[in-house]
């Protein structure tokens, strides 16, 4: 046995330095590789949904972390159920989100919902009967009220909050883009 092992080692030593032993080419390695399609920077790498986009906090609390993973420290805690959040990045099961004030971090996707909501950003927002500045005012909502987004035209959004529905000027809301139209 020792002679065979010695002969093998001696045979390997005969290969001149800097030269590799011949190998058979791998058919898969020599096959043409398909071109990778460039990733759309306006789509999420995990979901292929638009980036940025708006989502809603599902529960009563959501930890926003410094990075995408449980080992990263918690920088912020969202505490308003239904709060609209803007997704700005994706990494595996994590979404980078921010609120209306730009606060945020990485949140696990299970804490978020695709149901849309908006935040009233004016002291008093008038909810009207139709998307018209002369339409009857049904009620008013104070700064910070969260409502469910039902529809949007170019200038108005139909919102539901506390069982009431009405049309609000888009400029009085956060959670919908200025050019966004929803039917």
Language-model segment annotations:
Residues 3-13:
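Bacterial N-terminal signal peptides
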Residues 16-20:
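Sec/Tat signal peptide C-region and signal peptidase I cleavage site
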């Amino acid at each position: 046995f020792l002679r065979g092992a010695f002969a093998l080692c001696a045979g390997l030593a005969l290969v001149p330095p800097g030269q590799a032993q011949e190998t058979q080419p791998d058919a898969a390695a020599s096959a043409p590789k398909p071109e990778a399609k460039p990733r759309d920077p306006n789509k999420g790498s995990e979901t292929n949904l638009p980036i940025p986009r708006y989502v809603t906090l599902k529960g009563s609390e959501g930890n926003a972390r410094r990075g995408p993973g449980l080992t990263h420290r918690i920088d912020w805690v969202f505490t308003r159920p239904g709060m609209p959040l803007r997704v700005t990045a994706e990494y595996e099961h994590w979404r980078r989100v921010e609120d209306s004030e730009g606060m945020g971090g990485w949140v696990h996707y299970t804490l978020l919902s695709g149901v849309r909501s908006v935040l009233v950003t004016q002291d008093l927002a008038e909810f009207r009967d139709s998307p018209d500045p002369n339409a009857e005012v049904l009620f008013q909502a104070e700064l910070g009220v969260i409502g469910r987004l039902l529809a949007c035209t170019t200038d108005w959004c139909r919102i539901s909050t506390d069982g009431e529905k009405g049309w609000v000027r888009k400029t009085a809301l956060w959670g919908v883009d200025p050019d966004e139209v929803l039917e």
